[in-house]
Amino acid sequence: MDVVVGAHVPQFICETFYEDGKVRLKPIKGQCVPETFRISSSRAFRESFPVGSHFICRDGFFMLKGSDETVFIKASDVIIYKIIRK
């Protein structure tokens, strides 16, 4: 997939996981975005569910680039809407 900053990201499935001692969100393998991407959301949301929980993420995501050139997906907690596992 070509990374285009500012591009709309369609619906995909993501999961919570541990990285550097923190709970993070990432797309699962085989989705429309690489699993190496991280999804920016509130810490309260990420920590509300067991690690390994899967979610269906609806339309409304956009690719952004941080000051350190990291590409990530910005998400509102209301867009991450359905737990499908755990």
Task: Please describe what each predicted stretch is.
Residues M1-D20:
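Structural detector for short beta-strands of small beta-barrel domains
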Residues G52-S67:
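Flexible glycine-rich surface loops and low-complexity tracts that mediate binding to linear polymers
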Residues T70-K86:
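Short peripheral tails and domain-boundary helices/loops at the edges of structured domains
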Residues C32-S48:
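Beta-strand/loop nucleic-acid-binding surfaces
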Residues C14, I39, C57-D59:
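Short, surface-exposed loop motifs enriched in S/T, G, D/E and P with embedded aromatic residues
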Residues G21-T36:
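Short, basic/aromatic beta-hairpin or loop at an interaction surface
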Residues K29, R43, D59-M63:
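Short glycine-rich, polar/acidic loop-and-turn segments at beta strand-coil junctions
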